[in-house]
């Protein structure tokens, strides 16, 4: 199964994760562990998932002073996760410090984790960005600005909406990693994300990775839902 498809393990605890993963016995997935699960279970959940053979995107969106982020990333790299992230709004010094921490903490003989930055959350509308955050750019301009800053700071890519991918390819080049959440099957509810797309649309727009949560985790048959998403994402029959 494709490892450019990331399954969001948005569960409150390990018991729910274990129950969900029973549907995928023998499969090596790329999974996302977010704040709720990591703060509840700690590094033990990472160890458990690695022992099961899964790749891990640890989605903690670090945003602090450079020295603190550097130290935190050093610790996260020692867990042997595959992808981590920060908020681009933390600035270039913070992002450069994140890379330094990952290099220092990576396990011997292994590459450092992929490091990406959040430009704007997928729940952010342009009206919200201007009125509440105080950024007087269009949403597209703000995302492109942060993506360029991210690349200049030495990170591998960004978390962004699928709708922003074509513009970011222009600004940052074809090798720049774009990780796109807010992915839903056409039959699903949008829920709390404003800028959403289907797996097929994400493929057409050129996303590097897609993150899918509820469409798979809340499905009556998670494995079949996973295969449906994979088929739409890769454009092949499974």
UniProtKB/Swiss-Prot annotation:
Sites where the protein binds substrate: 10, 32, 59-68, 122, 184, 193, 213-214
GO molecular function: orotidine-5'-phosphate decarboxylase activity
EC number in record: 4.1.1.23
Broadest EC class assigned to this enzyme: lyase
GO cellular component: cytosol
SUPFAM superfamilies noted in UniProt: Ribulose-phoshate binding barrel
GO process terms (BP): 'de novo' pyrimidine nucleobase biosynthetic process; 'de novo' UMP biosynthetic process
UniProt cross-references to PANTHER family, sorted A to Z: OROTIDINE 5'-PHOSPHATE DECARBOXYLASE
Role played: Catalyzes the decarboxylation of orotidine 5'-monophosphate (OMP) to uridine 5'-monophosphate (UMP).
Descriptive protein name: Orotidine 5'-phosphate decarboxylase
Organism: Bacillus anthracis
Classification of source organism: Bacteria, Bacillati, Bacillota, Bacilli, Bacillales
């Amino acid at each position: 199964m494709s490892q450019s498809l990331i399954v969001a393990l948005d569960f409150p605890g390990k018991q729910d994760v274990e129950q969900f993963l029973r549907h995928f016995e023998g499969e090596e997935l790329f999974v996302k562990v977010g704040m709720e699960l990591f703060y509840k279970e700690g590094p033990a959940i990472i160890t458990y998932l690695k022992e099961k053979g899964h790749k891990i995107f640890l989605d903690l969106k670090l945003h602090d002073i450079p020295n603190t982020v550097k130290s935190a990333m050093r610790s996260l790299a020692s867990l042997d996760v595959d992808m981590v992230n920060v908020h681009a709004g933390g600035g270039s010094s913070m992002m450069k410090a994140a890379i330094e921490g990952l290099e220092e903490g990576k396990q011997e003989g292994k590459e450092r984790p992929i490091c990406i930055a959040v430009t704007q959350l997928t729940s952010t509308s342009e009206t919200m960005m201007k009125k509440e955050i105080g950024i007087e750019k269009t949403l597209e301009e703000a995302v492109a600005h942060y993506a360029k800053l991210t690349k200049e700071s030495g990170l591998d890519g960004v978390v962004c909406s699928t709708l922003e991918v074509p513009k970011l390819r222009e600004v940052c080049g074809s090798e720049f990693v774009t990780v796109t959440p807010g992915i839903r099957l056409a039959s699903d509810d949008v829920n709390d994300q404003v800028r959403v797309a289907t797996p097929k649309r994400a493929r057409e727009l050129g996303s590097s990775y897609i993150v899918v949560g509820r469409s798979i985790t809340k499905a009556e048959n998670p494995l079949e839902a996973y295969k449906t998403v994979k088929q739409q994402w890769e454009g092949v029959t499974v």
